[in-house]
Structures are given as C-alpha cells and as structure tokens.
C-alpha cells in the first residue's frame, strides 16, 4: 500500500511539471518541433514514468514526462466473503436417519426371531404341560420366621425380718427361709403358696400357705407365714414399693406379643393366590381355544386351495391328452 501511494504522488508531480512545460512552449513565438523521441526500454519499469525529448528551434533540448501513466494496482481491497456449507448439516441428518433406520431394522429382526413358530405353538398345545406356570404358594411370614422369645432372669428378692431371719420369694411362689445364725443351705425352709387370680381393687386376696408338716393356712396375699424350726408359726407382712420409686437404672423387659390372627392372614393370602391361579388358567384356556380356531380356519383354506389345484391339474391333463390325440 505504501508503494502504491508513492507511485500516485510521483504521477501527480509529473502531470504538474508537464503542464508547466507545455505552457512555456506555447509562450514561445515559434512552434517547437519534435526532433527526437526516445523511450529507453532498459530503464522503463512499471514504477518509472515515460520521458520524451523535445528539441526547440533555438537548439535547446527539453525533457517532457509522459502524461499517460500505467495502470497502478488499486489500493482498495475487496472484502473477503466467507461461505458456509449447509450441505454438511444435511449430510449429518441423513446419516443420523440412516443409523436410526438400521437400528429399527435390527430391533424388528430381533423381535421376529424371538416370535415362536406355528410348529412350536402347536407342540405346546398338544403337550399336557400347562402353558402358564402356576404361581407357587409362598410360605407365610409366620411359618418362616418364628417369633423370638427372650428369657429374662429376674433376681430373687430377699427380705430380712426384725428377728434376723431371711425370706426369699422365688418365681414359682415358694418362700425360702433362713436363720441369721445357721447355715444358708441347711436352715432353709420352703413354703408353697398358691396365688389366686386378681380381682377388683379394694378386695383382699387370700392364698394358701403350706407348712413343712403339710398343714395349709389361709392368709392374705401380702402376708407371709413363717414356721420356725421350733414349730412356732409367725406371720410377716410384705410391703411392695410403688412403681414411682423404681431406681432409674432398672429396665423393665417384656416378651414380644405373638400375632393374634396368623391363621386368618395365611388363609387370606392363600385365597388370593388361588384366585390369581384360576384367572391365569382361564386366560390360558381362552387363548388356546382362539389359537386352535385360527389353525382350523387355516387348514380349511389350505384344503380348499388343494382341491382347486387338483382340479386344475386334472383339466390340464385332459387338455394335454386331447392335443396329443
């Protein structure tokens, strides 16, 4: 671009100089004659202007630059136009559609290959095995998993009377007595008590206490009858602490309650399974009947086609025999 600007400036200067020289030549009284015109090819280039030699009548030689300039390259450049190929998008869509069609055809072939043939269905119908597998009865949760029963060992409470005797009440209702001065094992005396059922609050519960000699004594439930080794019978009253005074570290354990109606739940589930089996068997029989009817219709059509073909064959044979005769 800088070289083009310089060429344009030199051309303008040459035109100005030529115009001034022409005006000078016209001012002379005599018209100048063209004596010699030389255009040296060796020095002429695309960038240098053409030089003309003009000889005046007085013998003076003047160099005149040519007015016609060679075509210079244009400084203005044409903007570049960017073309976008839309065919590539169309090709990508076509390729995607072709891939989808190939995938659909593969899936269709797989589905057709998985369909059972008429021979296989006919064999299934002729066999005695049921077409629909029966739903096996599941074992109820009550039968499979038995409830876990936790055994909790409760420590035996021991009471000491004012006379120094120890009283231990076991779970079975037996009362063991031991004196303070005797051995714990040899001095034990057992009283068997039969507990009565709980009644309304405010009533006194009586229970039998059996001594070592076989005698039975009727005493209230909150009293203990103790017979000493000497034969004296003493009565002690047991006071139970209220539930609110239980120590915070005591844990009350209770066994889990068994299900109240396991048999009814199992029977209901069994009825539901049997009903589902009956519905499945009914549907299977209906489908078998429809398929057999379809096969019978197809057999009838094939028999008619076979009869028609046999008749056409006979007609062709008769026609061939007549032509041969």
Curated annotation (Swiss-Prot):
There is a cross-link at residues 269, 288 (Glycyl lysine isopeptide (Lys-Gly) (interchain with G-Cter in SUMO1)). Residues 267-325 form the bZIP domain. Residues 268-293 are annotated as: Basic motif. One of its GO terms (biological process) is positive regulation of lipid biosynthetic process. Sumoylated with SUMO1. Sumoylation on Lys-288, but not on Lys-269, is required for nuclear localization of this protein. Sumoylation is enhanced under hypoxia, promoting nuclear localization and stabilization. Stimulated by phosphorylation. Phosphorylation of both Ser-117 and Ser-126 in the SCN regulates the activity of CREB and participates in circadian rhythm generation. Phosphorylation of Ser-117 allows CREBBP binding. Phosphorylated upon calcium influx by CaMK4 and CaMK2 on Ser-117. CaMK4 is much more potent than CaMK2 in activating CREB. Phosphorylated by CaMK2 on Ser-126. Phosphorylation of Ser-126 blocks CREB-mediated transcription even when Ser-117 is phosphorylated. Phosphorylated by CaMK1. Residues 1-27, 92-111, 124-146 are annotated as: Disordered. Keywords: Activator, Biological rhythms, Differentiation, DNA-binding, Isopeptide bond, Nucleus, Phosphoprotein, Transcription, Transcription regulation, Ubl conjugation. This is Cyclic AMP-responsive element-binding protein 1. It comes from Bos taurus (Bovine). The lineage of its organism: Eukaryota, Metazoa, Chordata, Craniata, Vertebrata.
